[in-house]
A protein has these predicted regions:
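A detector for small-residue-rich transmembrane helices and their helix-helix packing motifs
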Residues: 2-197
């Protein structure tokens, strides 16, 4: 392992551990305050709720909700962050905003949506598509591993489970795919398409 690879690996691990740790701290605060943070979820088509799109991605409705999201976020987040901390943060922001806007526009009224699952679906989409966009064989292979490990989550974009925001999942996935193109190494205007490597 080269020093650069070791640095990227360590940075990715630190980032995702801090990110997930923050989710647990926020849930502890929510629990200790009688769920005072729950209103910061997304209430569809209310103008003042647009400001809650980002914080909603860091909040959960109970420990079971958070625990269900913790492992996939750790795994997919670490894989995505290996490309670089800056890239991960851009991908996360794009995904969270697209997912949140999708929920705000399409979710039923009344409802309240929060949780990291939109980001998880976004990271899934990003990791699967990224290798094809950048024509990197190693990333295509990584995307294949992601499909094997977490491909079954795609059922979550269908409206089959009451109380689960399929809208957040679907638009999170779309946001992740968008992020793969927007953060591509070949995104600069006039830059030739990358060759496979």
């Amino acid at each position: 392992m080269t020093s650069e690879t070791a640095y990227r690996t360590t940075s990715a691990l630190k980032l995702i551990l801090v990110w997930v740790g923050l989710l647990w701290v926020l849930e502890a605060v929510d629990y200790a305050t009688g769920h005072a943070l729950d209103p910061f979820g997304i209430a569809p088509r209310q103008a003042d709720e647009l400001l809650d799109i980002v914080p909603a991605a860091f909040l959960h409705f109970g420990w079971d909700h958070l625990m269900a999201n913790t492992v996939p976020l750790l795994v997919l987040g670490f894989m995505a962050a290996l490309r670089g901390v800056g890239t991960f943060l851009v991908v996360a922001l794009i995904t969270i905003v697209v997912s949140g806007l999708g929920v705000w526009i399409t979710a039923p009224v009344p409802s309240n949506t929060a949780g990291a699952s939109g980001l998880i679906f976004g990271l899934f989409g990003y990791l699967v598509v990224r290798g094809f966009v950048d024509r990197r064989i190693a990333d295509v292979a990584l995307g294949g591993v992601v499909v094997v490990l977490y491909g079954s989550i795609l059922w979550g974009v269908l409206p089959t489970t009451p109380g689960v925001s399929w809208q957040g999942h679907l638009f999170g996935l779309i946001g992740g795919v968008m992020a793969a193109f927007m953060t591509s190494h070949a995104r600069a205007k006039g830059e030739p398409k990358p060759t496979w490597h």
